[in-house]
Amino acid sequence: MALKEKEFGHYAKRIDYTKVSGNLDLPNLIEIQTETYDWFKKTGISEVFREVFPIVGHEGNIVLEMLDWEFREPRRTISQAKDESKIFEAPIYSNLKLTINSKDVEVEKAIVKGEPELIKAWIEERVGHMITILKKTTDVIYYDIHSGDEIATCTVTIKERLDDKLIVDITIEKEGEVFFGDFPLMTGKGTFIVNGSEKVVVSQLVRSPGAYYKIDLNRKNGENVYYVDLIPSRGTWLEFESDHKKIKVGKEEKFENVFYVKIDKSRKVSVANFLTALGIIKEDALDIFGDNKLVKSTYELDPYTGDILYDQSIAVQEIYKKIRSGETATPDGATKYLYGLLFDKRKYDLTKAGRFKLIQKLSVENRIYNKILAEDIKDVNGKVVFTEGTLMDKEAINKLKGILKAGACLQEVKFSDEIICSNKIQKIKVYVDNEVRSRVANIIGIDPNATDEYVTVPDVLATFSYLLNLTDGIGEVDDIDHLGNRRVRTIGELLQNQFRIGLLRIEKNVKEKMSTSNLFKMKPSNIINNKPLSAIIGEFFNLSQLSQFMDQTNPLAELTNKRRLTALGPGGLSRERAGLEVRDVHYSHYGRICPIETPEGPNIGLINNLATYAKINSYGFIETPYRRVIGCKVTMENDYLTADEEKNYVVAQANIRLSDKGEILDEQVVARFQGENIIAGRNDVDYVDVSPKQIVSIATSCIPFLENDDANRALMGANMQRQAIPLIAPNSPYVGTGVEYAAARDSGLAIVSQYDGIVDFVDATRIVLKTKEGLKNYNLDTFVRSNQGTSLTHVPLVRQGQKVEKGQVLADGPSIDKGELALGQNVVVAFTTWNGYNYEDAIIVSERLVSEDVFTSIHIEEYTIERRQTKQGPEEITREIPNISENARKFLDDDGLVIIGTEVKPGDILVGKVTPKGQTQLSPEDKLLQAIFGEKSKNVKDNSLRVPNGGEGIIQAIKRFPREKYEVSADVLEVIKIYIVQKRKIQEGDKMAGRHGNKGVISKILPLEDMPHMEDGTPVDIMLNPLGVPSRMNIGQVLEIHLGMAAKKLGQKISTPVFDGMINEELIEIMDKAGMKNFGKEVLIDGRTGEKFDNPVSVGVMYMLKLSHMVDDKLHARNVGPYSLITQQPLGGKAQNGGQRFGEMEVWALEAYGAAHTLREILTIKSDDIKGRTRAYESIVKDKKIPEPGIPESFNVLTREIQGLGFNIHMIDEKGNIKNIKSYDEADYVDEDLLTDCDEFEDEFDIDNFILSTNREPQKKEHLEDFVKVEDSFDLVDNLDDNELDDIDNEIDEINDQDELS
């Protein structure tokens, strides 16, 4: 077979093994983010403004209208926002018009003035601005109000002229521009910059608004119980359900199914009462629902109250009592409340998706499929289209749709005049049983042309009708996990919801101000306060579960983060309540949600990823493309279908056999229909998959030979590719799948040209393109820190003078090689054991990978320090730091900042900072220090920024943000950021993995000469344990090494797409062509002994990744560190400088060994025995025997908790004497024996040694005299009597007690 080469982008070529021709190109992979945000900016904001405005005051005399609005230019660029740790945002401004109407205003007449002047003076006094008369007629005068920037006019209509006054109507109109706050902008790659970090808003998968039916079994009587939930996006839930109750029919009592409704999860209300409350009388209800015994039994008797309430006002009040338990209301109040809950557009939101779902579920044509008509159906002109007795098959239903869309079968329904909504229902009668045509069912549907985004009375009737039909076996229950019933709330919709909440809060504030403010001095700018909107938006981006710190480890991680779907978050599921059904793979996920890629932990199945070709439609439902089949011929037309639409079609697989003309060759093919796999005739096929890879996500489709891997390992492989760290010399894989180019291009980390043009200039920092629109600049990143601390660096691919096309990659980003994704390295792998060093998935690697920097990565860490204004004065950045030797300051420049390029170690000073100290009474020791070191040590404290443990590296950059030039927090004078870059070679303890879930930790790095080598002398790079393959069933890695070796020998890179790639025969063929024998096994020779291994070993080229679980980040040591305040036990974890927890199971291990003394030591003086650990420390310092342990603090915590429960608890010694626990609490921590006597201290104190130990010389001669004064002060202690000493002790105790309290 001739090998065909295919170009991927403009630089990479691969031998392509794709079988399915006419594959659809992958769409823009981040359009789920960019397109919906564009919709929000262009349409979403306008929709919310239209909902809220105009705002009318409570009395109706003040109206605030929205004229227009706009986004202005952003306040700062993306790079400035990152550097300054600010938000990349733009201000929203709007033009508002305020109209104030004052009716029947009395204006007292003055003697000299005419009417226009009189009214002018009266208005000027109240408005506070000069006004000019513009125009006047007999009864109407027009004025212009001079009020600064705003346009303000006044119209006065004289209604009545009395002797002493005028009665006038005044209308004042003011127009002005109002600032509505700053709004975060999306960058071109689908992210937001919030506080300097890139964030992504993840799309949410939630239950769609609509009507959902289910049937349960009543275990008491074996009867079916029928339920329906009518769920809005926002507003009141309606739940109908059936119940088996005893009812009276005349004198006779019998059990019947009766129907109830719950309004917003309240107590049950009879459906009869509910319909009566809506103004539908019993006769009309029986006419609508037909001769149905369930409806009749529901109307017979309300078993809860004992009677049926046919009066509307009584029914409304009864329902009100059930909803608002314990409250009473007038009939008018109850009616207003009930109708407000259900039919008020502002309180109830069904959304476009909810209306779409209701029409889809409740429309008549979808419910009478395969039923026989019990009446004639006429079109709008009265012509009979279907006669009674017609079987409604697929063809008849398609014909009926058009007739119903035109308005046939509609009838009006009567209900309360106070409910303003559509009053049209569709009604068709069919026979319940096609064979025995005795009973007739009324199918009540809603108008297919309805557009209301709130529930209407016809919706309620059709919903209840469906439930009644379900009891007759007409209709079907809903599968809540079906993707037809779950929709995606994208970034645009999520932001629109937040914007609506903020604007509604502003509306509430405006209405309050309209009622309380001075009527005439009111203007748009002073009644709008934008803080509620800014607060809501800020809270969403900073605190929402859906606004996530972007995973920027590599391009694939970034891309996957943007395409993620979560069922968690506000309005979604919770981890604890989500069952197995909602987490499981569903047949409707095919082509829409990846069945492989999901987290392994408690979020499994709740966080998913979009499949490669999936799109979100305008209703929020996920669509996937299929190629249309017309008369057995597969066309090139692609239709995007939702899960609901797809179930009505027969869909065949992409890899069916086709002729050159695209005709299906086989008479029968495997296909899917209504969620089942079937064998279909070729004439029955409606659609064909566009590509075999449409079932999986981008990360999963990067795994070659995926079809040969177990699903669990494929899941790990997909997840671990996202953890691969960018290496300094990325290499794309020899064995790829063909999606590497699209993934890299759309990730946002490659620089892609937006224009056709010629490269005018190129260097490491920017590329300039000459285009028809002029010169276009593309700035390149060099050593920029990502969110995860990896290095973002762009490498140009174009040369000066080169022609480029729109969409061409101009520069590679991290983990990108010639425009293709390159997460790891191609290395020679042998599946063999070696002295037990690769036991349990451990990995042995060659020293070549270290010395040649094959797996070396660059990491950048940012350290920030602030210079603040304190109460004692401003902090200073300086080189002059008290008590610091010259050697410790050797890397600092004159300003006190570390010099760029310096190699620093933990503990080194990065920025010298001193903070002023408050003036207090100095102790003799402080006076001594002050005398030695002068004024500086007296006034300031060292608060310098130092390199933390594990933070060693080279200073890469320093950025300063002084208050004079940048926005900084209050009390901050300057912010300084230091960037330290680390070059990390691969080492023992680092985690590595392949693409098939084959992960392991490096256990040994062998010298090159010790590694086994092939007969031609080529040493292997990595040795993996062969036992890692059979039990894991990820055979793809074995096929990959054989194909990788063949590709390396041929010098060709290969593309083998998932489910559509190379078959075994082709693999054998290419291995033969590359000269590989023995099925890819090689004779290996031990590098140490020169002897051959007993058997040939599988050797080949595998693509290996270095993962972001490096031993450098995990290694941690602690001597004495922080302790927990309550339990006094050491903190845990590296971040808290804590220790390793010696937990319950570790205690069992020591108990099993009988190591009693070690165990006692660990549980007391090494942990929370406060007195004991103090004494032990003292003993170690003085080289004495370690004392006996005391009482652990956790024992005291336990006793206090028991005392808190009201128990009196005592401690009893061996003799039975009661000991006071409190005395143990208040005992001194240090034993009196350990206190040093003043005389001993005086004898041991040596001034000369003290000076030497400080590494400082006395600055002045007088300082030596101060030492003598201090020495003399120790003599004073000897001269004090016992009482005076006791007084001093008491004062010291009081000070210590105060310190403990504080």
Curated annotation (Swiss-Prot):
Q: What is its EC number?
A: 2.7.7.6
Looking up SUPFAM superfamilies in the UniProt record yields: beta and beta-prime subunits of DNA dependent RNA-polymerase
- Kindly indicate whether the keyword Nucleotidyltransferase belongs to this entry: yes
Keyword Transcription assigned to the entry: answer is yes
Output one GO BP term. DNA-templated transcription
Pfam families noted in UniProt: RNA_pol_Rpb2_1, RNA_pol_Rpb2_2, RNA_pol_Rpb2_3, RNA_pol_Rpb2_45, RNA_pol_Rpb2_6, RNA_pol_Rpb2_7
State a single Gene Ontology molecular function: DNA-directed RNA polymerase activity
Catalysed reaction, written as an equation: RNA(n) + a ribonucleoside 5'-triphosphate = RNA(n+1) + diphosphate
Protein's UniProt name: DNA-directed RNA polymerase subunit beta
Q: Which organism is it from?
A: Spiroplasma citri
